[in-house]
Amino acid sequence: SISFMISLYNQNKLKIHTNIGLSLPFGDITTNHKMGMEMHNHDHEILGHDHEVMRNAYGMQLGSGTVDPKISLTAIKYLKNLSYGSQIGGLFRLFENKSGYSKSSNYYINSWLSKNINSSLSISSTLIYKFLTSISGKDDLIIEMTSPESDVKNSSNQLLMSGIALNYLFSNSTLNGLRLAIEFQSPVMWFNNGVKMKLDNQITIGAQYSIH
């Protein structure tokens, strides 16, 4: 994907900017897998024709097959040892790919509060709402009865997550510019349209290095 950040306001310790970009269709949308003999015979009996190779479910296709616009708006307020902000955005699936469907659009609202413990360490809390729309259309080579992920009726959901994170910025001469972060997130509410696997807690660890 490619994106550009445009500053809209930067006064009185308040920053507002927008990100505008495009999600590019580099991932595959036609990945397949070979069936075992038992599954092969079962499908042959039900479908009436041979399926030695089966198209993977929608969630296992890493690409979208389309060029999709994405946009977000972010506002951050800075205080002495505290900052808070919110971001609203989305990835808009407006077009149909060559397999006959468009992937789910993704909309979100992310709000956070961050406090500096000292010049290197900060702690933050987040609240994230995500809305995933249903897949529009259908890939005729994906067999719905094989798994819930293969049925477009199960592709939509809404999710509310809460999280807490620690960030550490190194300031010594050797590791200057290196930032380490660890975040724990837990689902607060989850609404599924259809059948989906249960969502559990998750931990994310990341590193960022800035060249000055």
Regions found by a protein language model. Give the residues of each.
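Outer-membrane pore/translocation modules
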Residues: 1-98, 149, 212
